[in-house]
Amino acid sequence: MFEEKNALRGTEIHRRERFDPGPELRALMAEGRMSVMESEESPGGRTGWLATGYEETRQVLGSDKFSAKLLFGGTAAGRIWPGFLNQYDPPEHTRLRRMVASAFTVRRMRDFRPRIEAVVKATLDDIEATGGPVDFVPRFAWPIATTVICDFLGIPRDDQAELSRVLHASRSERSGKRRVAAGNKYWTYMGQVAAKTRRDPGDDMFGAVVREHGDDITDAELLGVAAFVMGASGDQVARFLSAGAWLMVEHPEQFAVLRDDPDSVPDWLNEVARYLTSDEKTTPRIALEDVRIGDQLVKKGDAVTCSLLASNRHRFPDPEDRFDITREKPSHVTFGHGIHHCLGRPLAEMVFRTAIPALAHRFPTLRLAEPDREIKLGPPPFDVEALLLDW
Protein backbone atom coordinates (compact mmCIF):
# COMPACT_ATOMS: atom_id res chain seq x y z
CA MET A 1 0.00 0.00 0.00
CA PHE A 2 1.03 3.63 -0.14
CA GLU A 3 2.44 5.30 2.95
CA GLU A 4 3.15 9.01 3.19
CA LYS A 5 6.78 10.09 3.14
CA ASN A 6 6.42 13.86 3.56
CA ALA A 7 4.70 16.23 6.00
CA LEU A 8 1.47 14.32 5.44
CA ARG A 9 2.98 11.13 6.87
CA GLY A 10 0.48 8.94 8.65
CA THR A 11 -2.55 10.09 6.70
CA GLU A 12 -5.01 7.30 6.02
CA ILE A 13 -6.54 7.28 2.56
CA HIS A 14 -9.44 5.08 3.66
CA ARG A 15 -12.67 6.44 5.07
CA ARG A 16 -12.85 6.12 8.82
CA GLU A 17 -16.50 5.26 9.34
CA ARG A 18 -19.80 4.96 7.53
CA PHE A 19 -19.48 7.03 4.35
CA ASP A 20 -17.31 9.85 5.74
CA PRO A 21 -13.86 10.25 4.13
CA GLY A 22 -12.47 11.47 7.45
CA PRO A 23 -10.60 14.68 8.32
CA GLU A 24 -7.20 13.70 6.89
CA LEU A 25 -8.53 12.85 3.44
CA ARG A 26 -10.78 15.91 3.49
CA ALA A 27 -7.70 18.04 4.21
CA LEU A 28 -5.99 16.65 1.12
CA MET A 29 -9.12 17.33 -0.91
CA ALA A 30 -9.21 20.94 0.31
CA GLU A 31 -5.58 21.50 -0.67
CA GLY A 32 -6.43 20.40 -4.18
CA ARG A 33 -3.05 19.00 -5.07
CA MET A 34 -1.37 15.68 -5.72
CA SER A 35 0.18 14.23 -2.55
CA VAL A 36 3.58 12.52 -2.53
CA MET A 37 3.49 8.97 -1.23
CA GLU A 38 5.89 6.07 -1.03
CA SER A 39 5.04 2.94 -2.99
CA GLU A 40 5.85 -0.45 -1.57
CA GLU A 41 4.11 -2.25 -4.42
CA SER A 42 6.87 -1.85 -7.01
CA PRO A 43 10.68 -2.20 -6.83
CA GLY A 44 13.28 0.54 -6.84
CA GLY A 45 11.49 2.90 -4.45
CA ARG A 46 9.26 4.50 -7.07
CA THR A 47 7.87 7.91 -6.26
CA GLY A 48 4.16 7.55 -5.59
CA TRP A 49 1.35 10.08 -5.87
CA LEU A 50 -2.22 10.22 -4.57
CA ALA A 51 -4.78 12.01 -6.76
CA THR A 52 -7.78 13.33 -4.82
CA GLY A 53 -9.33 15.74 -7.34
CA TYR A 54 -12.14 14.73 -9.67
CA GLU A 55 -10.53 16.17 -12.81
CA GLU A 56 -7.07 14.83 -11.91
CA THR A 57 -8.47 11.34 -11.41
CA ARG A 58 -10.27 11.42 -14.76
CA GLN A 59 -7.08 12.67 -16.40
CA VAL A 60 -5.01 9.80 -14.99
CA LEU A 61 -7.56 7.08 -15.73
CA GLY A 62 -8.28 8.40 -19.21
CA SER A 63 -4.67 8.86 -20.30
CA ASP A 64 -2.67 6.45 -22.46
CA LYS A 65 0.47 7.77 -20.76
CA PHE A 66 -0.10 5.49 -17.77
CA SER A 67 0.21 1.71 -17.56
CA ALA A 68 -1.79 -0.74 -15.47
CA LYS A 69 0.32 -3.67 -16.64
CA LEU A 70 3.69 -2.41 -15.37
CA LEU A 71 2.54 -2.56 -11.75
CA PHE A 72 1.86 -6.28 -11.97
CA GLY A 73 4.55 -7.32 -14.43
CA GLY A 74 7.21 -5.03 -13.02
CA THR A 75 7.52 -6.40 -9.49
CA ALA A 76 9.86 -9.11 -8.29
CA ALA A 77 6.97 -11.51 -7.75
CA GLY A 78 4.57 -9.80 -10.12
CA ARG A 79 2.89 -11.37 -13.10
CA ILE A 80 -0.13 -10.71 -15.24
CA TRP A 81 -3.11 -12.93 -14.43
CA PRO A 82 -4.56 -14.10 -17.76
CA GLY A 83 -8.03 -12.67 -18.29
CA PHE A 84 -7.82 -10.06 -15.51
CA LEU A 85 -8.70 -7.00 -17.57
CA ASN A 86 -7.53 -4.50 -14.96
CA GLN A 87 -3.95 -5.74 -15.40
CA TYR A 88 -3.72 -5.29 -19.16
CA ASP A 89 -2.60 -2.43 -21.42
CA PRO A 90 -3.46 -1.99 -25.10
CA PRO A 91 -3.29 -3.73 -27.49
CA GLU A 92 -3.78 -6.88 -25.35
CA HIS A 93 -6.42 -5.10 -23.27
CA THR A 94 -8.27 -3.93 -26.39
CA ARG A 95 -8.37 -7.45 -27.83
CA LEU A 96 -9.63 -9.13 -24.67
CA ARG A 97 -12.07 -6.43 -23.60
CA ARG A 98 -13.67 -6.38 -27.05
CA MET A 99 -14.36 -10.11 -26.77
CA VAL A 100 -15.90 -9.83 -23.30
CA ALA A 101 -17.85 -6.67 -24.17
CA SER A 102 -19.61 -8.57 -26.95
CA ALA A 103 -21.62 -10.32 -24.21
CA PHE A 104 -22.82 -7.00 -22.70
CA THR A 105 -24.86 -5.79 -25.67
CA VAL A 106 -27.91 -3.57 -25.28
CA ARG A 107 -30.09 -6.39 -26.59
CA ARG A 108 -28.69 -8.90 -24.10
CA MET A 109 -29.28 -6.44 -21.24
CA ARG A 110 -32.85 -5.81 -22.40
CA ASP A 111 -33.61 -9.51 -22.76
CA PHE A 112 -32.16 -10.22 -19.32
CA ARG A 113 -34.26 -7.64 -17.47
CA PRO A 114 -37.32 -9.91 -16.92
CA ARG A 115 -35.07 -12.40 -15.12
CA ILE A 116 -33.83 -9.63 -12.83
CA GLU A 117 -37.41 -8.59 -12.11
CA ALA A 118 -38.34 -12.19 -11.31
CA VAL A 119 -35.41 -12.58 -8.90
CA VAL A 120 -36.26 -9.32 -7.13
CA LYS A 121 -39.94 -10.24 -6.82
CA ALA A 122 -39.17 -13.70 -5.43
CA THR A 123 -36.75 -12.22 -2.90
CA LEU A 124 -39.24 -9.61 -1.70
CA ASP A 125 -42.02 -12.23 -1.56
CA ASP A 126 -39.83 -14.34 0.71
CA ILE A 127 -39.05 -11.38 2.98
CA GLU A 128 -42.71 -10.38 3.20
CA ALA A 129 -43.78 -13.94 3.99
CA THR A 130 -41.25 -14.15 6.82
CA GLY A 131 -42.31 -10.88 8.39
CA GLY A 132 -40.10 -8.32 10.07
CA PRO A 133 -37.68 -7.54 11.42
CA VAL A 134 -35.32 -8.90 8.74
CA ASP A 135 -31.59 -8.51 8.17
CA PHE A 136 -31.61 -7.12 4.64
CA VAL A 137 -27.95 -7.90 3.91
CA PRO A 138 -28.25 -11.72 3.78
CA ARG A 139 -31.95 -11.70 2.85
CA PHE A 140 -32.09 -8.91 0.23
CA ALA A 141 -28.71 -7.67 -1.02
CA TRP A 142 -26.71 -10.88 -1.31
CA PRO A 143 -29.47 -13.16 -2.70
CA ILE A 144 -30.34 -10.70 -5.45
CA ALA A 145 -26.72 -9.92 -6.32
CA THR A 146 -25.63 -13.55 -6.31
CA THR A 147 -28.58 -14.93 -8.26
CA VAL A 148 -28.60 -12.22 -10.91
CA ILE A 149 -24.84 -12.24 -11.55
CA CYS A 150 -24.64 -16.04 -11.53
CA ASP A 151 -27.62 -16.36 -13.88
CA PHE A 152 -26.06 -13.84 -16.25
CA LEU A 153 -22.74 -15.68 -16.23
CA GLY A 154 -24.32 -19.13 -16.51
CA ILE A 155 -23.67 -20.53 -13.01
CA PRO A 156 -26.25 -23.26 -12.17
CA ARG A 157 -28.71 -22.31 -9.42
CA ASP A 158 -27.72 -25.36 -7.34
CA ASP A 159 -24.12 -24.10 -7.14
CA GLN A 160 -24.78 -20.42 -6.52
CA ALA A 161 -25.07 -20.37 -2.73
CA GLU A 162 -21.83 -22.29 -2.19
CA LEU A 163 -19.97 -20.23 -4.79
CA SER A 164 -21.11 -17.02 -3.12
CA ARG A 165 -20.00 -18.35 0.27
CA VAL A 166 -16.47 -19.28 -0.82
CA LEU A 167 -16.03 -16.05 -2.79
CA HIS A 168 -17.07 -13.98 0.22
CA ALA A 169 -14.85 -16.07 2.53
CA SER A 170 -11.85 -15.62 0.23
CA ARG A 171 -12.03 -11.89 0.94
CA SER A 172 -13.49 -11.56 4.41
CA GLU A 173 -12.08 -14.45 6.46
CA ARG A 174 -9.73 -13.13 9.14
CA SER A 175 -7.66 -16.32 9.03
CA GLY A 176 -5.16 -16.27 6.16
CA LYS A 177 -5.28 -20.06 5.90
CA ARG A 178 -9.08 -20.06 5.54
CA ARG A 179 -8.93 -17.22 3.00
CA VAL A 180 -6.48 -19.19 0.86
CA ALA A 181 -8.55 -22.37 1.14
CA ALA A 182 -11.70 -20.52 0.09
CA GLY A 183 -9.84 -18.86 -2.78
CA ASN A 184 -8.59 -22.23 -4.01
CA LYS A 185 -12.15 -23.60 -3.97
CA TYR A 186 -13.34 -20.58 -5.90
CA TRP A 187 -10.67 -20.94 -8.59
CA THR A 188 -11.27 -24.68 -8.89
CA TYR A 189 -14.98 -24.15 -9.43
CA MET A 190 -14.51 -21.34 -11.95
CA GLY A 191 -12.07 -23.58 -13.82
CA GLN A 192 -14.81 -26.19 -14.09
CA VAL A 193 -17.22 -23.53 -15.38
CA ALA A 194 -14.73 -22.40 -18.02
CA ALA A 195 -14.05 -25.97 -19.16
CA LYS A 196 -17.76 -26.82 -19.38
CA THR A 197 -18.45 -23.62 -21.32
CA ARG A 198 -15.68 -24.45 -23.76
CA ARG A 199 -17.27 -27.87 -24.42
CA ASP A 200 -20.90 -26.77 -24.46
CA PRO A 201 -21.46 -22.98 -24.57
CA GLY A 202 -24.86 -21.98 -23.20
CA ASP A 203 -27.06 -18.92 -23.65
CA ASP A 204 -25.18 -16.83 -21.11
CA MET A 205 -22.24 -14.42 -20.96
CA PHE A 206 -19.47 -17.02 -20.99
CA GLY A 207 -21.26 -18.98 -23.69
CA ALA A 208 -21.52 -15.86 -25.85
CA VAL A 209 -17.79 -15.21 -25.54
CA VAL A 210 -16.93 -18.81 -26.52
CA ARG A 211 -19.38 -18.94 -29.43
CA GLU A 212 -18.22 -15.65 -30.91
CA HIS A 213 -14.52 -15.71 -30.01
CA GLY A 214 -13.70 -19.30 -29.07
CA ASP A 215 -10.68 -19.54 -31.34
CA ASP A 216 -9.27 -16.21 -30.17
CA ILE A 217 -9.43 -16.63 -26.39
CA THR A 218 -7.17 -19.11 -24.60
CA ASP A 219 -8.33 -21.47 -21.86
CA ALA A 220 -6.31 -19.49 -19.31
CA GLU A 221 -7.88 -16.22 -20.45
CA LEU A 222 -11.38 -17.71 -20.34
CA LEU A 223 -10.81 -18.91 -16.78
CA GLY A 224 -9.39 -15.52 -15.78
CA VAL A 225 -12.28 -13.63 -17.32
CA ALA A 226 -14.78 -15.91 -15.55
CA ALA A 227 -13.09 -15.47 -12.16
CA PHE A 228 -12.55 -11.73 -12.65
CA VAL A 229 -16.09 -10.85 -13.75
CA MET A 230 -17.74 -12.99 -11.08
CA GLY A 231 -15.44 -11.68 -8.35
CA ALA A 232 -15.79 -8.05 -9.35
CA SER A 233 -19.54 -8.03 -10.00
CA GLY A 234 -21.07 -9.90 -7.07
CA ASP A 235 -19.51 -7.82 -4.31
CA GLN A 236 -20.21 -4.52 -6.07
CA VAL A 237 -23.89 -5.21 -6.61
CA ALA A 238 -24.40 -6.47 -3.05
CA ARG A 239 -22.67 -3.37 -1.65
CA PHE A 240 -24.88 -1.07 -3.70
CA LEU A 241 -28.06 -2.82 -2.62
CA SER A 242 -27.08 -2.88 1.07
CA ALA A 243 -26.05 0.76 1.07
CA GLY A 244 -29.05 1.77 -1.01
CA ALA A 245 -31.44 0.22 1.51
CA TRP A 246 -29.56 1.84 4.40
CA LEU A 247 -29.63 5.29 2.79
CA MET A 248 -33.36 4.89 2.18
CA VAL A 249 -34.14 4.51 5.86
CA GLU A 250 -31.59 7.12 6.96
CA HIS A 251 -33.11 9.76 4.65
CA PRO A 252 -36.89 9.33 4.89
CA GLU A 253 -37.63 12.55 2.99
CA GLN A 254 -35.60 11.34 0.02
CA PHE A 255 -37.03 7.84 0.44
CA ALA A 256 -40.44 9.44 -0.12
CA VAL A 257 -39.23 11.04 -3.36
CA LEU A 258 -37.93 7.68 -4.59
CA ARG A 259 -41.17 5.93 -3.64
CA ASP A 260 -43.50 8.49 -5.22
CA ASP A 261 -41.55 9.63 -8.28
CA PRO A 262 -40.30 6.93 -10.70
CA ASP A 263 -38.32 9.56 -12.61
CA SER A 264 -36.10 10.05 -9.55
CA VAL A 265 -34.57 6.55 -9.81
CA PRO A 266 -31.62 7.55 -12.06
CA ASP A 267 -30.77 10.45 -9.73
CA TRP A 268 -30.97 8.11 -6.73
CA LEU A 269 -28.65 5.64 -8.42
CA ASN A 270 -26.06 8.27 -9.36
CA GLU A 271 -26.05 9.80 -5.90
CA VAL A 272 -25.73 6.43 -4.15
CA ALA A 273 -22.83 5.56 -6.45
CA ARG A 274 -21.14 8.90 -5.75
CA TYR A 275 -21.76 8.86 -2.00
CA LEU A 276 -20.96 5.19 -1.45
CA THR A 277 -17.81 4.74 -3.58
CA SER A 278 -17.49 1.08 -2.62
CA ASP A 279 -13.99 0.74 -4.10
CA GLU A 280 -12.12 3.55 -2.39
CA LYS A 281 -9.09 3.74 -4.66
CA THR A 282 -7.67 2.41 -7.89
CA THR A 283 -4.68 0.17 -8.29
CA PRO A 284 -1.66 2.38 -9.02
CA ARG A 285 -0.89 3.40 -12.59
CA ILE A 286 2.74 3.73 -13.72
CA ALA A 287 3.68 6.76 -15.84
CA LEU A 288 5.12 5.75 -19.22
CA GLU A 289 6.57 9.22 -19.76
CA ASP A 290 6.72 12.56 -18.00
CA VAL A 291 3.17 13.92 -17.77
CA ARG A 292 1.56 16.86 -16.02
CA ILE A 293 -1.48 16.06 -13.89
CA GLY A 294 -3.13 19.28 -12.78
CA ASP A 295 -0.26 21.44 -11.56
CA GLN A 296 2.03 18.52 -10.77
CA LEU A 297 4.69 17.00 -13.03
CA VAL A 298 4.62 13.21 -12.71
CA LYS A 299 7.84 11.70 -14.01
CA LYS A 300 8.28 8.55 -16.04
CA GLY A 301 8.19 5.52 -13.73
CA ASP A 302 6.23 7.28 -10.96
CA ALA A 303 3.14 5.52 -9.59
CA VAL A 304 -0.22 7.30 -9.23
CA THR A 305 -3.11 6.01 -7.14
CA CYS A 306 -6.48 7.71 -7.56
CA SER A 307 -8.71 8.08 -4.52
CA LEU A 308 -12.17 7.49 -5.96
CA LEU A 309 -13.65 8.30 -2.55
CA ALA A 310 -12.02 11.75 -2.47
CA SER A 311 -12.60 12.44 -6.15
CA ASN A 312 -16.33 11.82 -5.82
CA ARG A 313 -16.52 14.25 -2.88
CA HIS A 314 -14.13 16.84 -4.32
CA ARG A 315 -16.79 18.51 -6.47
CA PHE A 316 -19.14 18.91 -3.50
CA PRO A 317 -16.95 19.94 -0.55
CA ASP A 318 -18.12 19.89 3.05
CA PRO A 319 -20.61 21.06 4.30
CA GLU A 320 -22.44 20.73 0.97
CA ASP A 321 -21.23 17.15 0.63
CA ARG A 322 -24.28 15.32 1.85
CA PHE A 323 -26.47 12.61 0.42
CA ASP A 324 -28.88 14.48 -1.83
CA ILE A 325 -30.68 12.89 -4.79
CA THR A 326 -31.82 16.34 -5.97
CA ARG A 327 -28.20 17.34 -6.53
CA GLU A 328 -27.57 18.70 -10.02
CA LYS A 329 -25.47 16.35 -12.14
CA PRO A 330 -23.86 14.23 -9.39
CA SER A 331 -21.04 12.97 -11.65
CA HIS A 332 -18.82 10.29 -10.16
CA VAL A 333 -15.92 7.97 -10.95
CA THR A 334 -17.14 5.04 -8.86
CA PHE A 335 -17.11 2.77 -11.91
CA GLY A 336 -13.76 4.14 -13.06
CA HIS A 337 -13.01 6.03 -16.26
CA GLY A 338 -11.23 5.45 -19.54
CA ILE A 339 -10.42 2.07 -21.04
CA HIS A 340 -10.64 0.32 -17.66
CA HIS A 341 -14.08 1.62 -16.69
CA CYS A 342 -16.29 -1.11 -15.23
CA LEU A 343 -17.51 -3.41 -17.98
CA GLY A 344 -20.41 -4.66 -15.86
CA ARG A 345 -21.76 -1.20 -15.06
CA PRO A 346 -24.91 -1.57 -17.22
CA LEU A 347 -25.80 -4.82 -15.45
CA ALA A 348 -25.11 -3.42 -11.97
CA GLU A 349 -27.21 -0.33 -12.70
CA MET A 350 -30.06 -2.42 -14.10
CA VAL A 351 -30.14 -4.51 -10.92
CA PHE A 352 -30.19 -1.37 -8.76
CA ARG A 353 -32.83 0.38 -10.87
CA THR A 354 -35.03 -2.70 -10.52
CA ALA A 355 -34.45 -3.73 -6.90
CA ILE A 356 -34.45 -0.42 -5.00
CA PRO A 357 -37.73 0.99 -6.39
CA ALA A 358 -39.35 -2.43 -5.93
CA LEU A 359 -38.20 -2.42 -2.30
CA ALA A 360 -39.59 1.08 -1.77
CA HIS A 361 -42.98 0.18 -3.20
CA ARG A 362 -43.27 -3.19 -1.46
CA PHE A 363 -42.37 -1.75 1.96
CA PRO A 364 -43.33 1.96 1.93
CA THR A 365 -42.88 2.22 5.72
CA LEU A 366 -39.45 0.58 5.79
CA ARG A 367 -37.42 1.65 8.83
CA LEU A 368 -34.63 0.62 11.14
CA ALA A 369 -35.84 -2.07 13.54
CA GLU A 370 -33.53 -0.76 16.27
CA PRO A 371 -32.99 2.97 15.59
CA ASP A 372 -30.58 3.45 18.47
CA ARG A 373 -28.37 0.52 17.55
CA GLU A 374 -25.29 1.27 15.45
CA ILE A 375 -25.21 -0.30 11.99
CA LYS A 376 -22.62 -3.07 11.85
CA LEU A 377 -19.87 -2.33 9.34
CA GLY A 378 -16.96 -4.46 8.18
CA PRO A 379 -13.37 -3.31 7.63
CA PRO A 380 -12.56 -0.93 4.75
CA PRO A 381 -14.32 -0.33 2.45
CA PHE A 382 -16.83 -0.56 5.32
CA ASP A 383 -19.41 -2.84 3.77
CA VAL A 384 -22.72 -3.00 5.61
CA GLU A 385 -22.55 -6.34 7.43
CA ALA A 386 -25.98 -6.28 9.03
CA LEU A 387 -29.05 -4.11 8.44
CA LEU A 388 -32.06 -5.05 10.57
CA LEU A 389 -35.18 -3.44 9.10
CA ASP A 390 -38.90 -3.56 9.80
CA TRP A 391 -42.00 -2.14 8.15
Curated annotation (Swiss-Prot):
CDD domains: CYP105-like (cd11030). Its EC number is 1.14.-.-. Involved in the coupling of aromatic side chains of the heptapeptide of vancomycin. InterPro entries: Cyt_P450, Cyt_P450_B, Cyt_P450_CS, Cyt_P450_sf. Its cofactor is heme. Heme binds at C342. This is Cytochrome P450 165A3. Pfam families: p450 (PF00067). Keywords: Heme, Iron, Metal-binding, Monooxygenase, Oxidoreductase. SUPFAM superfamilies: Cytochrome P450. GO terms for biological process: vancomycin biosynthetic process. Disulfide bonds: none annotated. It comes from Amycolatopsis orientalis.
